[in-house]
Amino acid sequence: MILNSIKSLIKKIFPFTNNIRYDNQTVKIMEIVLEPDSTFIDVGCHKGEVLDQAIKFSPNGRHFGYEPIPHLFSDLVNKYDNKCQIKNFALSDSIGESEFHHVVSNPAYSGIKKRSYPGNENVNKIKIKTTTLDYELINESRVDLIKIDVEGGEYGVLKGGKNIINKFHPVFIFEHGLGASDYYDTNPSDLYDFFESLDYNIYTLKGFINQSTVLTKEKFVDLYLRNKEYYFLSVFKA
């Protein structure tokens, strides 16, 4: 009984400490990548914690936040007023409507598809609107950094943005983890091949900060399958 309780506690603490590490690394990367007039895109904006940092590092830039959950969207609109463009969409590879699993008890786990959850969660199905990165951003003058945190739907987001990727070559910080992306019938080889076809390299967040070697396909797949890392960075090879 005691051993089971300890194991349960470790399972809860491990992702929490990892998330703190990823948050700190994300801020460091934003400090490296963003210029005062950079354009930042927050896909899965949630409460705007990352968007806050974009405003700090790029006070003269244009910033976009995408959040499909109605009450979070309303909170973001009130929070940012005219500082950012906040949009009530989920990003995908198509424009239209979709069923969306709103995890009421833990909104950060919400997504178009129901994924595995660490506990018993209260999930409501709602209808949301979808759009694509290409449709939203193709007429912008620059796009510098895109953060994607959509609980497994990241490959769809990327496929909907091939034109803006080729035009702007933005840096990507993206979540890609076992227990989420596999519910979208996506595997790490798909993402690696996608980025490779566009002349992008993939790093761990720490690897990019420390200017380490790029991830090979085998290493990227291995980190995913062993759940050793679930946040990554991709950057154009130029």
Predicted regions located by residue number:
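Phosphate/nucleotide-binding beta-alpha loop and adjacent structural elements of enzyme active sites
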Residues: M1-A238
